[in-house]
Amino acid sequence: MTPETRYAKSGDVHIAYQVMGSGPIDLVLIPGLFTHVEHQWEEPSFARFLGRLASFSRLIVFDARGAGLSDQAPELPPMEEQMDDVLTVLDAVGSSSAAIFGLSQAGPMAILFAASHPERTRAIVLYGSYASPRRQEGYPW
């Protein structure tokens, strides 16, 4: 069963989000490049993954600005605006602090969120991620 999709306003942009589960901690899954909160349930393995996360937490998922059901953006917004969208969704669901799960490309933004908002960050989880999206001095990959 697909959870209800709701919207939170971040500046002039509507951010689509869903909440499922009722565990003792809030867990916000920050999406990678491609997201769609309703279509993600159509992929059986990803739906099982989300269900497992929701079995021990109150899982909060959202579509990034410019993707899925969130308002479209003419270009990829700066990481700081994306970080504000996470705050907007946390505020909309009444979460004072959450474990932040950065999936793939969302890893750097999850790190920035945790560093900028330690009072709202209970823990940080990175999966399939990286510290920098491109080669730079001090990060030669």
Label the model's feature ranges.
Residues 80-98:
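Conserved acidic catalytic loop of the alpha/beta-hydrolase fold
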Residues 71-83:
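Catalytic nucleophile-loop/oxyanion-hole region of alpha/beta-hydrolase
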Residues 1-6:
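Short, hydrophobic/aromatic-rich segments at coil-to-beta transitions
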Residues 7-69:
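Conserved HGGG/HGGXW glycine-rich cap/lid loop of the alpha/beta-hydrolase fold
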Residues 100-102, 127:
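Short beta-strand immediately N-terminal to the catalytic nucleophile in serine-hydrolase-like folds
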Residues 102-106, 110:
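Gly/Ala-rich beta-loop-alpha elbow adjacent to hydrolase catalytic centers
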Residues 58, 97-99, 121-123:
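Structural signature of beta-strand start/N-cap positions in the alpha/beta core
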Residues 111, 115-116, 120-141:
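Flexible "cap/lid" loop of the alpha/beta hydrolase fold
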